[in-house]
C-alpha cells in the first residue's frame, strides 16, 4: 500500500473544523470567553491541544489553507498563527507569512501566543528587529501590540535596550 507522506496531506478547512468540533469543551469555552472581551466565536479548545494539532498540521501541505481560511472560529485564527510559527521554513519566507497573519489578529490571546511561538525571532534577531519596526506606528491596536509583545518577548537585551525604549515610546505616542 502506498501511503502519503505527511507533507503530501493537504490541510483543509473541513479537516480543521472537524478537529475543532471533536475537541470542543463547552465548560472551557465559557471560562475562556470571559477572558476575551468582544470575541464571541470561541469553541473552547485548550491551548495545549491546539499546539499539538498545529505541530501536526505544520508538517503537512498547509499553505493553501492558510491563505484561504476564513477564520470562522477564534481557534482557527489561533491555529493559522501557530502553524505558520511551527512550520519549517527560511526566515524570509516565515516573515512573509507573519506579514499576512498579523492583520488578522483581533485579540490579545492570539497576539501573545503567536509572538511567543515565533522562536526563530531569537535566531534571526536583525531580520525580526527590522520587520517589527513598522508595526510600532500602526493605527491598528493588535498590530501595535504585536510589535510590543515581540519586542518584550525577544529583544529585551542590552544591545536593543535604548532603541526598544524609543520604539515603545513611539508606539505610546502614536496610539494616544
Give the predicted meaning of each segment.
Residues 1-172, 176:
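Alpha-helical scaffold domains
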